[in-house]
Structures are given as C-alpha cells and as structure tokens.
Amino acid sequence: MRAFVSALLALWSLSVFSPAAHAQSGQWLGGSAIQSSVQVGAPGEAWVGVWVDAPVVTTMRTRSPMAVSFVVDTSGSMAGPKMDNARLAAAAMIESLSDGDIVSIYGFATDVTEVSAPTVLDPVSRQMLLRNVGHLVAGGGTNLEGGLRAGISRMTSAPMSHAVRRVFLISDGQANVGVTDPRALGYLAAGATEVGTQITAIGVGYDYDPMTLNAVAVQSAGRMHHLGTPDQMAAILETELSWMSRSVALSAVLEVRPASGIVILGAATTGATVVDGVLRMPLGAITAGQRRELLFRVRVPTADIGRRTLATASLRFETPEGAHAAPQSAEVAMTVTREAPRATPAPRVAAMVAQYDASEAERAAAQLLQQGRQAEAIARLDAARASVASTATSYSFEDSAVQGALSSRAAELGAAAAGARAASSPAAMHERSYELQAAPMAADGY
C-alpha cells in the first residue's frame, strides 16, 4: 500500500494548487447553429451547439479546502479483492488530502455504518482515519439509498470555507434494500447539488446497475467510472483528486432561453432537460482547461427574410472560494435568406453532432451485445468509426482540440469494434456491453 500511496502523494505534490481568482475572467461561453443561414420557406429545424471552454491557467495559488465523503458498498459481493482495493483507495485518499480538509467514511450493506464521522484532517486524526478504514467489512444486502443519504447529509454540515465538495460512491451490485428505482435514486442524488456537492459514482465489475449509477452521476452533475477490475481504483482516484484540485468554477449551471417564436425541440446531451421551454444543464465543478458542450435542436420560423436570434445561453457559477462569479452570456443567431445558403456547416457543431451519433451507436451496440447480436453490434461500431473519422478530416477546424477529440473518438470506436469481435462468449459480450455504456457518459463529461 505504501507504494500506491507514495505514487498518489507524488501526483498530489503537482496538484496542490488551483487556479487563481482571475481565472474567472474572460469569456468561456460560445455557441452557434450548425448553419449560419437558411432559405426562406425551408424546413426550419436545426442543430445548435453551445459550449463552455474553461481557461487553461498557469498562475496558481493554494487550493481551496475540500470536504469529501467516501461511501463504500460493503455488501457480501464486495468481499475479497474489491473490498481490499476499496480500503486501499480510502487510505490513499486520506493520505493524499491536506490538513484542514474534512473526510467522512460510510459503509452500506443492509444497513449503513458510520466508519468515521466528518473529521478535520491533522496529523493525529489522519492516523485515526487510516485505522478506521479497516472497519470496512463486506456482508449483507445493498442499501444504496442509505449510503447516498449518509454521504450527502454530511455535506450539508460542511462549513462555507470548504466549497469543493465530493461524495465518492463505490458499488459492485444492484440496490436491493430501501429505494431501488434508478429514477428515484437519481432524484435523491440531485439533492446533492443544493449543497454544492457532486457525486463520483464508481461501478466495479460487471454486475452493477449502470442505469442507477449513471443517474446518480448525471443528476448530481458528477462523474461516472466503470472499473472492469478493482485494481483500477488507483487510476480513478488519481484523476478525481487532480480534477478537484484544479477547479475554476463550482455549482455551474448552463441555461439556454429561446428567442420569441423559437422552440427548443429537445436536447441531445446527457443531463440537459427542457422545462417550460428553457433548456437547463447543471455542470457542477469545472476544471481548468475543461470543455463542456450542449447540443440541441430548435424549430425556426422561416417565412420572413432577415437575421433571427435563436437563443441566449447563460452560464452561472461560483468561484472555488464559494463567491458568485459574474454570469456570462452568448447569443446564437441565424439568417433567413432569399437564396439557398452555400456556407458549409459550422465545424464545431458538426463535430458535436458526430460525437452524439457516436454515442448513440455505442448505446445501440451495447444493447445488441446484451441480446447476443454480435455482428450487428460490430457493424454499428464500424459505421460510427468511419463517420467520426470522416468528420475529423472534412472540416477546417480553427480549434485543433476539437479535431483531436474526433480522431480520438474514432480510434476508441475502432478499439470497441475490435473488442466486440473478440468477444467469444455471452459473458465476454456482456462485459463489452458495460464498456460501451460507459463511453457516452465520458464523452458528455461525466
């Protein structure tokens, strides 16, 4: 364990600072319709993309204090390597966090066990928490509801000074005690956002319920990780701690209000919902250099020639210190013209559509593999790879990162197709389906 902890401490020594306050200055928000113009009288439906590009910051200062709750499934199925690695991950986190951070630990089986109440880290309490990690013992059912409630409730008592808040939820099974409906558990997780908290859900193995853990991550504007084997917890922990330490915005929310006469038909991006005609997407914490995108369709009246505002996007968030930052806004417009438009589609929005189509193909392929329809799944993935690769080379991208993301996605789709081809048994196809379900979540920023 010492080697693992030492590795994480080395990572943390590079990440103990977070962006300075001036990181909140500048425009992060942008947007565009896929076409800048449409011919008068033409069908008036169009893709629209809105994006948040957080700045890459080089000026640093001491990071803000964190409040973390570690919530571990201690049901019987977690016995063995899964529980061993969960203890190791908890211990590594305790070693890696700084004095002054707040940590709590809970185990949930049939009942919820408070392993450690919220504790402010110092040299003495750190050793106590490390000893308490050994009290995580497997046995019983899976009271996911109870574990969520315990972790979230402790965030409500976190002081305002600890604005960076996270619940880490680890499970390998399906909820079978208390509330078990994925939508209800997602609604419970959504309550975490009211106290500035996100939930990182970590599914271990190939028997957990992806629908439930996805709902928990999305509704809390958190993160979702699929772990094929429990020893991958090390990489997950490294990623999460690094991201948390580099937060430039907290409790971020992206909203899109349509202009008069414009109708938002629906969102393609996971986590975005339309309520009373307004599109809303909680983003939670945003990391320096992170990009979040929102893709949706609108209906545009095309009877009259002229420029039309389609919608106004707004971004609201808090600083890592918990102060309200100045909101940002961006207008998206389109021109109705007499002649047929000749302009090529907006490259970034075309890329967003290609990424969305890839996610739909991955979801469909996952279902096909679950049904044993291997050849159809492979065909969907191959077609998606070709489409994404074509988009990457068909446009002149001003932003090389957008093109790079497309190239990476094409490579991932190719690898997924190869994995599906190599699946020689129903069990192997089941495992590949879990990996395919995780890919769209990662693509949408979860």
Where are these predicted regions, by residue range?
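Extracellular adhesion/glycan-binding regions together with long Ser/Thr-
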Residues: 268-290
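Short aromatic-acidic-glycine turn motif
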Residues: 117, 259-267, 319-324
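A surface/secretory-pathway sequence property marking extracellular, secreted
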Residues: 252-253, 257-276
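Bacterial N-terminal signal peptides
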Residues: 5-16
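Sec/Tat signal peptide C-region and signal peptidase I cleavage site
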Residues: 17-23
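Hydrophobic residues positioned within well-ordered beta-strands of beta-sheet architectures
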Residues: 29, 46-48, 68, 252-254, ...
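Long, acidic serine/threonine- and proline-rich intrinsically disordered regions
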Residues: 292, 300-446
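Exposed acidic/Ser/Thr-rich ligand/metal-binding surfaces
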Residues: 24-25, 29-251, 300-305, 385, ...
